[in-house]
Amino acid sequence: MLSCWCATAFGWGKIGHDAIAYIAECNLTPKAKKNIEKYLGGRSIVYYASWMDQVRHTPAYRHTNTWHTNKVDAGGNYVPDPEGDAMTFLDDCIAKVEDYRNQNDSTVTVSIRFIVHLVGDMHCPGHVKYPWYKSFKFTLSGKEYGLHNYWDEWALTLSNKWHYLEYGHQLDRCSKREKRDIAEGTPRDLSLIHI
């Protein structure tokens, strides 16, 4: 159902999430796009790209706060978070969507929304939590940034002032062969690119 996610984009914050979702949507098969839009009430996946960030502070979704990142050790090896993390939750959501015939529509709908957001989070270097994650600071043009804050808030706005469509057009440059190779991998495979 979810046929291809292109790994050429970077992204975070609303513009980055929208750009990644747009690139993903452009690479969906027509059948997959139609099925997804059926569950999303006819809306594009871009519409829901930042949804998880919007609901994470509500009582119903507060438990998802740890699900936006992945922890790694000093060697860059993935370390599952006992409270949950992006990788574990993404695997769970994908399994629910793949088993859509045995799930109720609301479960599939919410799982698709989570997948769209988590794929964007997993493309963000600031969402890989190294042991020094909170203490890593750097200065750029006289301003101090934290790693996560820079990637979530500033990386895209300090470079090009593009709309998500422009990022999509500039970054979705994979050849057909590269796209096939990406589609054969799993989200777990793709997440290792940033670790």
PLM segments and residue spans:
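Soluble secreted/lumenal catalytic domains
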Residues: F10-N149, L158
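Flexible, glycine-rich surface segments
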Residues: K129-P187
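Conserved small/polar residues in nucleotide/adenosyl-binding loops
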Residues: I193-I195
